[in-house]
Amino acid sequence: MDMVSLKFIGIGLMAIGIYGAALGVSNIFSSLLSSIARNPSAAENLQRMALIGAGLAEAMGLFSFVIAMLLIFS
């Protein structure tokens, strides 16, 4: 296999990172909704923590996307 085909295989594998970020964010907000349903008085604190966690999970997906773009255009 030449380097170009290996590069595109690596780019395809980067999709796993983006898929993982999507699963992480969906898990965070699913847990947030069930936690707020159980304890509505803690909604403000839970929402703040969920947004921080979602931002960190989404950052991993964006890093994976940036690396894939670097591989495509290098």
UniProtKB/Swiss-Prot annotation:
SUPFAM superfamilies: F1F0 ATP synthase subunit C. Gene3D superfamilies: F1F0 ATP synthase subunit C. Keywords: ATP synthesis, Cell inner membrane, Cell membrane, CF(0), Hydrogen ion transport, Ion transport, Lipid-binding, Membrane, Transmembrane, Transmembrane helix, Transport. The chain crosses the membrane at residues 8-28, 52-72. Pfam families: ATP-synt_C (PF00137). It is found in: Cell inner membrane. One of its GO terms (cellular component) is plasma membrane. The record marks 58 as: Reversibly protonated during proton transport. One of its GO terms (molecular function) is proton-transporting ATP synthase activity, rotational mechanism. It is a multi-pass membrane protein. Belongs to the ATPase C chain family. F-type ATPases have 2 components, F(1) - the catalytic core - and F(0) - the membrane proton channel. F(1) has five subunits: alpha(3), beta(3), gamma(1), delta(1), epsilon(1). F(0) has three main subunits: a(1), b(2) and c(10-14). The alpha and beta chains form an alternating ring which encloses part of the gamma chain. F(1) is attached to F(0) by a central stalk formed by the gamma and epsilon chains, while a peripheral stalk is formed by the delta and b chains. F(1)F(0) ATP synthase produces ATP from ADP in the presence of a proton or sodium gradient. F-type ATPases consist of two structural domains, F(1) containing the extramembraneous catalytic core and F(0) containing the membrane proton channel, linked together by a central stalk and a peripheral stalk. During catalysis, ATP synthesis in the catalytic domain of F(1) is coupled via a rotary mechanism of the central stalk subunits to proton translocation. This is ATP synthase subunit c. It comes from Rickettsia akari (strain Hartford). The gene is atpE.
